[in-house]
């Protein structure tokens, strides 16, 4: 079985492409079934395995398969599933085999490959991806082991390095940008659209600035109300957004919608109602919640996750010592995992040896039982049984020794000597 990771992320593709390749949560299970069965070879000797990790910054397919053409098949499947021409998608896709796939998984879970260096959200997202793949019946021995090792490595990296300290989060970056637009965030009305983890983080940072008003709009009114109450804010129905958008100076949106929920026309009307007072908008969703054309409006300052990345990277540069320490830990753990993977390659051979040996044993036992039933001397039957088993079990190694010559023969002799610890060396003439 070969490990393979196929994907795109914020390093290789802009948000405009990433949002087209993202998988909504409810689509992942059926997508896994299709991907695993159609493109990883349901007739393969070993059952193929797969998992899909889809976040704001990456969409990745983790595979374990015998199919040597899995790389091309995975890219083609991703292209067909999302209806994106292969020629458009392929230049942005990375394919990481074996140790590269292992190293990548360890780095992702440890926060080393994130836009926010050392952030912890990705670890939870990866665990969710594993849970979904397990529920879909898409995981097996190889990926299960990979992900369990991945989570252990992430825990070790975060526990023994300072990779997560003093990081500038996306939420903190959003506040910094708002402070560039408005002299005082405390004088502004802030609207949060959504009620997930990212919105909760943003609300925490903005609430610390003491805004004039904090409002949460969410599809599920009860969840939005709970979040608003945590920050002494209030909730409003999401359906009221088009008619009330003009009330807010700062709008932060991050929902799971597959289509934009804020269109150009609605924002144009809001700007007009505000008499062209500026609106600061942050779209943290992938796919995007706000139509990108909104960013062209004169009085609107629209930022996406990619835009916030520049501010985040400023804070990343100061922690390169922690990065080097984390990379060293990961490299050691990659080598350990590859050693385990190498041992797995002999499992089919060992299983076959057991099957063959057991077949020989059963055949000889059956023969012995017939002789005993016939009344033959038990001692003679046992002697014949043991002699037959001995001859048949050493027949393979003996034949191999007689077939090979030269260096191959010497290597095989050394190998056999290891099997049979008391075998005399070839230069021992004592006959013992």
Swiss-Prot record:
Q: List the disulfide bonds.
A: none
Extract the CDD domains matched here: NAD_bind_Glutamyl_tRNA_reduct
Q: Tell me the route in metabolism or biology where this protein functions.
A: Porphyrin-containing compound metabolism; protoporphyrin-IX biosynthesis; 5-aminolevulinate from L-glutamyl-tRNA(Glu): step 1/2
The EC code for this enzyme is: 1.2.1.70
Q: Which GO terms describe its molecular function?
A: glutamyl-tRNA reductase activity; NADP binding
Has keyword Oxidoreductase?
yes
Name the active site residues.
56 (nucleophile)
What is the catalytic activity of this protein? Answer: (S)-4-amino-5-oxopentanoate + tRNA(Glu) + NADP(+) = L-glutamyl-tRNA(Glu) + NADPH + H(+)
Q: Gene3D superfamilies of this UniProt entry? A: Glutamyl-tRNA reductase, N-terminal domain, NAD(P)-binding Rossmann-like Domain
GO annotation (BP), single: protoporphyrinogen IX biosynthetic process from glutamate
Q: Site Important for activity: which residues?
A: 104
Q: Which domain of life is it from?
A: Bacteria
Task: State whether it acts alone or in a complex, and with which partners, per the record.
Answer: Homodimer.
Functional summary from the UniProt entry:
Catalyzes the NADPH-dependent reduction of glutamyl-tRNA(Glu) to glutamate 1-semialdehyde (GSA).
Q: What else is known?
A: During catalysis, the active site Cys acts as a nucleophile attacking the alpha-carbonyl group of tRNA-bound glutamate with the formation of a thioester intermediate between enzyme and glutamate, and the concomitant release of tRNA(Glu). The thioester intermediate is finally reduced by direct hydride transfer from NADPH, to form the product GSA.
Annotated PANTHER family:
GLUTAMYL-TRNA REDUCTASE
Write the protein's name.
Glutamyl-tRNA reductase
Organism annotation: Burkholderia cenocepacia (strain HI2424)
Q: Which gene encodes it?
A: hemA
